[in-house]
């Protein structure tokens, strides 16, 4: 998701907040609207099964109509089974009761969440970074987003050979759109063509896998080389999002095609305002079937922070990414006539050349504004003012259509005091500049927080990555301020949001896959989580704990050699869903095979790289256990010893049994149990610790979080 100026919803890896907008088609008798009918996996034997014919027959049976072509919107038939159709409420109810149907849910509208960042992560350009270019060139990342700008230099195929032989996709992108050996595939589900109008999809794709392009900047600000984490990788663009958002049926269509086309990873920077259960969340559905085919899905956490429980990506088979800043930030200085200087946040490309203008702190209406710098509590974009100084301070720089700077409350009050106490107050707003941010990384305020409200014992988000003030390729069809009054057009622009952090982690996942092409999605996810930089709970609120950053900040270099990994297969996820009380009939359809939910599998015992448990508030003392199994991907004859590090303020007692793991061979698996006990947990904060398995070379770290807090508290 990215953040835009003014009403710009945070764009997060597509995550401007998920606004629900159901489109209805009026019939003479009842209103019809688009519903998605999810039917699980495709039959294992498809010789006599034609998905579309089955879907049409269901519609004929339910509607009583012989011709239902006008009812069918999409048929999902390549990677999983289902369809989207226009139904009345009573027809929806009848479909939901039919054998072979897992769920029926409305087609809601998802929206997008929107150079130095890779250097900050340690994945530097040049010979000092280890790369496997042959496999990197065979790695394909699919982006489900707003399309792509194919002419961008970031997607040039100079030096690229033909697409990998495994590629089964097409370039079905519309008129005047050409794919190449870098951008090897494009599909459109919006009827607009795959060309990116918003700029969001172009930005995310270039962040993960764009070519290295020298001397890029935003009007001279932040000059450097723009590049992706895996610039030799191939890109496939799936346009599921238009200016109006991203429909459920389009998102599922994109997953259906991307999986069958042969992508290796999926990056999706989209999200919703309301969390959805797994069987009604199109991203969770698509990502599950991708996981079964060996494809990891990376999704933005959302831009609903710092509110607790705002994380919308909550499935354990998805790698969920929060957003943090880097050591490069953009600031805009305000210089007053009395010589005082204040440092604010914005991305101001306008140069007033130090000229002073009258400051005006009155009404925002009328001719008194003309030719002045307006000092107001909120951002304005009036065309008659020279510039704007406001109190709308955020921890990210926004692009405006006129010179502006957002100050902290104290600094803004100082400016107001100067305006009110001076006969002829004047000042100026300088052009933005890049500064070194020594305090980085810090989770952005807009980044969505846990706890997970669907599976309370699964910690989300998983990790954090750069998502603040990211410079990357952009669509010249949109303005950098994303405002129709802004007549500027740029090839590279700066966006903030979890939409920007998501492709960073997609790039990291692709980087790992170039060294370990045989690794499963869960192994890659585990490597990223257990090697992440530890972050500290810097505040006294839930929003400043592991619910903000998960396992920590991604470290690409460490992640290619994690030592141990936590593996999770399809059967483990099915057992997890059994533990959440999904019935065996629905799970059989989802899994495409017989399922028996025997006993009660505790969701917290899913072999996840982090450990989390929500405790009953009624219990003053507690004991919880976590069962885990690790696989050795390091060296043979290695011995790992466990170490527990309690976080500040935690009074937990943590025991690990066995406390030593002796791995004789690579791929060997060993199990252990973590027992956590304590009493009187703070009802407003989690208590946490870290389990570290170390063999002297590798440090395999897992956060342990116990809490009683509820979002409704």
From Swiss-Prot:
Its EC number is 3.4.21.-. GO terms for cellular component: extracellular region. Its main location: secreted. Disulfide bonds: none annotated. It is an enzyme of class 3 (hydrolase). InterPro entries: Peptidase_S8/S53_dom, Peptidase_S8/S53_dom_sf, Peptidase_S8_Ser-AS, Peptidase_S8_subtilisin-rel, Peptidases_S8_3, S8pro/Inhibitor_I9, S8pro/Inhibitor_I9_sf, SBT. Glycans are attached at residues 176, 215, 223, 420, 536, 583, 627, 637. GO terms for molecular function: serine-type endopeptidase activity. It is found in: Secreted. The active site is at 145 (charge relay system), 200 (charge relay system), 499 (charge relay system). Residues 117-560 form the Peptidase S8 domain. Pfam families: fn3_6, Inhibitor_I9, Peptidase_S8. GO terms for biological process: proteolysis. Residues 356-415 form the PA domain. This is Subtilisin-like protease SBT4.9. The gene is SBT4.9.
